[in-house]
Amino acid sequence: MTDLTALTLADAKEGLAAKSFTALELTDAHLAAMESARVLNAYVLETPDKARAMAKEADTRIAKGERSNLLGIPLGIKDLFATRDVRLTACSKILDDFKPPYESTITSQLWRDGAVLLGKLNNDEFAMGSSNETSAFGNVINPWRREGSDTALVPGGSSGGSAAAVAAGLCLGATGTDTGGSIRQPAAFTGIVGIKPTYGRCSRWGVVAFASSLDQAGPFARTVRDSAILLRSMAGHDPKDTTSVDRDVPDYEAAIGKSVKGMRIGIPREYRIGGMSSEIEKLWAQGAEWLKAAGAEIVEISLPHTKYALPAYYVVAPAEASSNLARYDGVRYGARVNGKTIAEMYENTRAAGFGPEVRRRIMIGTYVLSAGYYDAYYLRAQKVRTLIKRDFEEVFAKGIDAILTPATPSAAFGIGEKGKADPVEMYLNDIFTVTVNMAGLPGIAVPAGKDAQGLPLALQLIGRPFDEETLFSLGETIEQAAGRFEPKRWW
């Protein structure tokens, strides 16, 4: 039998429908792969008993002739999604051994469509990070290595466990969240596909909040088609989430293979930043050539407020985080460190429970929201955000169908290489991705090449609001031209 963990999600769906193998066999193959890849530290919790029970239920449904979008498909879930009676920590000590009594809307939709839960995936603490080095459960190791080197590399963040697990064949797909690039950047670093849908496309109910006006959940998968299949189950209106948009969910998979002839693709001149590697520049030009060869028109565009996006993001996101994280006080759930007074108990609990990066962002957020600085920082950042959104609206109003940019300024870097002395160095990883969150747009990262050391590099496509289908069509065009990328197994 073929190695079941090497299948794409679409192939696995076909195999299950044809009864070439069972959902239990597919699940067991992934559980075995997870066991042999623990050195990657992708999972913070494995749920083999639950997975096998769900797989058996899927086999029963398949035997009855039932068809469903994800029936029998084993998935990993980022440890930011509430999963009923299954531990949720946000990879922070402050949530300790918390088991939510409810299910997030997105995971309940995945289980409705027949998916199987393999376990919870590692991420940066409270999704704050670009390298998965802030998790209370330790670093995730990227399954990719530089040629001729055994240096451990970061998988990107915050959804590093999700990206590493999909790239290493430890699940057929995974959930992630993206606040400033936390799906697209890890996907780029691990040679897989990651899409951040339009803000409001997927429910945020039951997902631990970082920055509520920026957070959006989305899928990780090995191919563009697999991403489209997963997004169909994840998307949809949810009355429990006031930011969820009531729009029909299209059949995203139908966009795969559609012609891109006549589409107008924008190349923003402001994304040509100083210090960009020649490899990224060449890849960007190559991506434009591939789309041109497929019949698309390449147009140079301007997004003049791009240079303000990163500083504005690092005012807005910490401000919202400081408000959202005020609820973690050790009173009703999670870890508690006692004190002589209730105020001291709050202080002790939060000091011991939050890691240094989370504490840093809470302090920045509290500072920019304080009476003396609210207008100077937070209000000004929100005005900049409006200008960034307007830049995109004006470009799309001129008939641009999508925008092509690099996904990251570099390939994956070594653990401990960045941000130790200066956190801003780490924040610069989000330079190509934050604008998409600030404007609430959809963005997809698609692997498109390798650097001189054999590490994957990706391109990003940015679309009009709720036009993920165009991104899937264009993304698949790049995927067909570039081919697929898989790490050599060393673990």
From Swiss-Prot:
Gene3D superfamilies: Amidase signature (AS) domain
Disulfide cysteine pairs (residue numbers): none
Transmembrane spans: none
Known partners and oligomeric status: Heterotrimer of A, B and C subunits.
Reactions this protein catalyses: L-glutamyl-tRNA(Gln) + L-glutamine + ATP + H2O = L-glutaminyl-tRNA(Gln) + L-glutamate + ADP + phosphate + H(+)
Similarity comment text for this entry: Belongs to the amidase family. GatA subfamily.
UniProt cross-references to InterPro entries, sorted A to Z: Amidase, Amidase_CS, Amidase_dom, AS_sf, GatA
Active site: K78 (charge relay system), S158 (charge relay system), S182 (acyl-ester intermediate)
The keyword Oxidoreductase belongs to this UniProt entry's keyword annotation: no
GO biological process: translation
Record-given protein name: Glutamyl-tRNA(Gln) amidotransferase subunit A
GO cellular component, one term: glutamyl-tRNA(Gln) amidotransferase complex
Source species, domain of life: Bacteria
EC number: 6.3.5.7
Keyword vocabulary terms for this entry: ATP-binding, Ligase, Nucleotide-binding, Protein biosynthesis
Role summary: Allows the formation of correctly charged Gln-tRNA(Gln) through the transamidation of misacylated Glu-tRNA(Gln) in organisms which lack glutaminyl-tRNA synthetase. The reaction takes place in the presence of glutamine and ATP through an activated gamma-phospho-Glu-tRNA(Gln).
Top EC class, one word: ligase
One MF term in the entry's GO annotations: ATP binding
Classification via PROSITE patterns: AMIDASES (PS00571)
Phylogenetic placement of the source organism: Bacteria, Pseudomonadati, Pseudomonadota, Alphaproteobacteria, Hyphomicrobiales
